[in-house]
Amino acid sequence: MSTETFRAAPGALLPDLSPREEVVLLARTLFREGFDDHLAGHITYRQPDGTLLCNPWYLTWDEFGPEDVIRIDVDGRVLEGDWPAPLGIPLHLELHKARETTVAVHNHPRWATIWADMQRVPPCYDQSSALGGGTVVVVDEYDGPANDPSAAQRAVKAMGDADIALLANHGVFVLAGSIRAAHQRSVAIEQRCRHAWLTEVAGGGRPLPEAARALFGRSNGEGFIGFWEAMARAELRRDPALLARS
């Protein structure tokens, strides 16, 4: 048996995807993970020219295809596409103006929103809940309507350098350097919130040791090669014609 490290050939784990296809698959995989609050939620994906790809308003995350993805500028003007930008897009616009973030994900996932409502960062009880790394904070400065730029500015400022924010009485905001990392972090924070709730309901447990939390916390979300790809392939099996829609 060879002891050499396996290195997948290009395309072995996932076909080459366009940026628009990446946005669609991120939305669909996360919808299946509980990021499914009806029309809520927005994803922005910064492109090399500084514009942002974004999911369209009026279509749910499990519904829109590559042809529906819109391109906007950092002021929210639609540059390409037939749909308007989501109502809450100011949060993303202020974030991208303030920080060099590639991907930002906002939604009201089933379990993370509970902890956001309680204004508590949940304990991390297992390794899967820590995958993707990053710092998690509670932000309670997002106190205006979703389309209010001043409320968005306050939230981004309060977030500081954190990678994941539980927006008090609202939902989550996840930042990452790639689609893969955004998927990993989004899945992990929702799993962390679910497992913490169930563990505490069952009588409590012992969180991960500090050394383990520190180790996982240093991850940029890129280390678990294959995780994102496997979940994306599952979506392509469910909708084999998806890539033909580009």
Pin down the residues of each PLM region:
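Glycine-rich flexible loops
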Residues: 2-246
